[in-house]
A protein has these predicted regions:
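Phosphate-handling catalytic cores of nucleic-acid transaction enzymes
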Residues: 141-145, 163, 246
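Non-catalytic accessory segments of DNA primases and related replication-initiation nucleases
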Residues: 1-132, 253, 257, 264-265
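TOPRIM fold recognition
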Residues: 1-10, 197, 209-298
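A short acidic, often aromatic-flanked loop/helix-cap motif at beta-alpha or helix-coil junctions
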Residues: 30-34, 149-152, 275-285
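Glycine-centered loop/turn motif at secondary-structure junctions
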Residues: 20, 138, 143, 215, ...
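Short, basic/aromatic recognition patches
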Residues: 131-148
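Residue-level detector of family-conserved "landmark" positions at structurally sensitive sites
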Residues: 26, 144-145, 273
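Phosphate-handling DNA/RNA-contact segment within nucleic-acid enzymes
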Residues: 111, 150-240
Length: 298
């Protein structure tokens, strides 16, 4: 590879880092114009949530993103004002073609994940009440099913379509079926949302179950994680413009930040932790369990 090619790759990687997409140590860039997956600095072992595409042909340009967060960075070796008309046209056609390819590939992955998720869900058994996670969290099985040692939870959207499933291990580790479409998706914890009762959106299924138990007059769902709260809340708002929507994030810094963002974007209220939350509680499920144990002020 020529020195010029190495320079282009270095500039591309630097632009990604500046835009919030940092590659994991040892990851290399292949500038062949094809879509590649790559490990990011904050990926766990075995994860490759990053993707990129880099062209060396004039004008050298690329794009990269994080499938987990939706963050995306575009880069070109030339400033827009320095591109010739021919280069602008080449770049525009390239971007349009690659965007169409990327969207088609993403839709195919989503369809496959939904099909695999449906198979898993249909072949799972009702969850055992003695499952270690349920016992430790003091949760009833509810809608949960089980395959082997894993709890299986359905991930759906507001049309009722199954997007995929979430697996919960006995130790509490969670993962979604690969390729699943997360935006706007959720896990039910009680009655199906229909716009007739306030909708409370939590992060995890256990927390949604806890709030549903504490507030049976509302409808609680799990928005999957802090980063997905906004998209789920916005989908609900678009479906029910006048509905009372309440965001119920976890108590950590990320939860508070993402919860506030979701509330603002969806014109919703937020349920903040009260001043008398027992020490050590990180979400409303912890609060419910502390209350069951008779912890002072719970």
């Amino acid at each position: 590879m020529s020195a010029t090619s190495w320079d282009i790759i270095e500039q591309f990687v630097a632009a990604l880092a500046a835009g919030g997409i940092e590659l994991a140590p040892g990851q290399s860039i292949t500038p062949d114009g094809k879509l590649h997956r790559v490990r990011l600095a904050n990926d766990k072992a075995g994860q490759r949530t990053g993707w990129y595409r880099l062209h060396l042909d004039p004008p050298p340009a690329g794009v990269a993103g994080d499938w987990r967060t939706g963050c995306q960075v575009k880069w070109c070796s030339k400033r827009p004002e320095r591109l010739s008309p021919a280069e602008r046209d080449t770049l525009r056609r390239r971007i349009e073609r690659e965007q169409a390819e990327r969207e088609a590939g993403e839709q195919a992955r989503h369809r496959e994940a939904a099909q695999r998720g449906a198979w898993v869900w249909n072949h799972a058994e009702p969850a055992s009440p003695s499952h270690e996670y349920l016992q430790r969290k003091r949760l009833a099985p509810g809608i949960a099913r089980q395959r082997g040692a894993s709890l299986v939870l359905p991930v759906v959207d507001f049309t009722g379509h199954l997007r995929g499933v979430q697996y919960v291990q006995p130790d509490g580790q969670k993962r979604f079926i690969a390729g699943m479409a997360k935006r706007g998706a959720w896990i039910p914890a009680g009655p199906k949302p229909d716009g007739t009762r306030p909708l409370w959106i939590c992060e995890g299924w256990g927390t949604a179950c806890a709030l549903q138990a504490m507030r049976p007059e509302v409808c609680c769902i799990a928005g999957l994680d802090a980063g997905n709260l906004a998209s789920t809340a916005i989908e609900a708002r678009n479906r029910w413009p006048a509905l009372d929507i309440v965001i119920c994030p976890d108590f950590d810094k990320v939860g508070r930040q993402k919860g506030q963002e979701a509330a603002e974007k969806a014109r919703a209220r937020i349920l903040p932790p009260t001043a008398d939350i027992p020490e050590g509680c990180t979400d409303w499920l912890d609060v419910l369990n502390a209350k069951r144990q008779g912890v002072a002020h719970a």
